[in-house]
Amino acid sequence: MNLVLEAKNIDKHFHKPKDFHVLKNVSFGVKVGEFASIMGKSGSGKSTLLYILSTMDTDYTGELYLNNELITGKTHQELSRIRNKNIGFVFQFHYLLSEFSVLENVMLPAKKLGEKTNTEIIHDAHQKLEMLHIGHLADQRASRISGGEKQRVAIARALINDPTILMGDEPTGNLDSHNSENVFNIFKRLKEEQGLSLLVVTHDEDFAKRTDRIIQMEDGIIVSH
């Protein structure tokens, strides 16, 4: 089985204000080209797990593999590069820089990675925006576009470095049903047309039911996947 991401025996405690065992021996994998969702009540550990899987949180025990490479124990600098190159992330809030144009926002992760010339990055950013049907917004200031458009810009930004996996933490949480449907269809298209792997934390049962697989969490444990 070809896995893009694998977690083995992930364990995590929060130590303040008192000890809380938030993740308990979590093991599962995401296959190449799979669109998986994580569901569970608030406090079940799903967002905490996602932040570990995305390499943003390193305070855990267990092993994490990305593209069959063990990434647990790497330095923050190494992880930053691995994350920027391999993982696209879409949050509930878009985190766009309002004073920048749409195009400039999309370009930022590629500039940080530093593997392409500015001309190549501009070309790639336009391409991602066109793919999401928002190419006409490229020169607009990010503060001037609608909420649904902002989330599509955030997706374009997450895709700029051609990641191997796209992760989402409640990416439709702030959107109405029309824009939520838009985001779902974009994700489905990325899986079907580009073979992208996706892992999305969601409260939206309708969204989750239409993904390839639901990973159900309860009290820090995966109860079904």
Task: Label each region the model flagged.
Residues 39-41:
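The feature captures the beta-strand-to-loop junction immediately N-terminal to the Walker
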Residues 54:
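Helix-to-loop junction immediately C-terminal to a conserved catalytic motif
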Residues 62-70:
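Conserved ABC transporter NBD signature motif
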Residues 100-109:
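Short coil-to-helix segment of the ABC ATPase nucleotide-binding domain corresponding to the Q-loop/switch region
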Residues 141-149:
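Conserved ABC ATPase signature
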Residues 160-164:
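A short, proline-enriched helix->beta-strand linker immediately N-terminal to the Walker B motif
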Residues 166-169:
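Catalytic Walker B motif of ABC-type/P-loop ATPase nucleotide-binding domains
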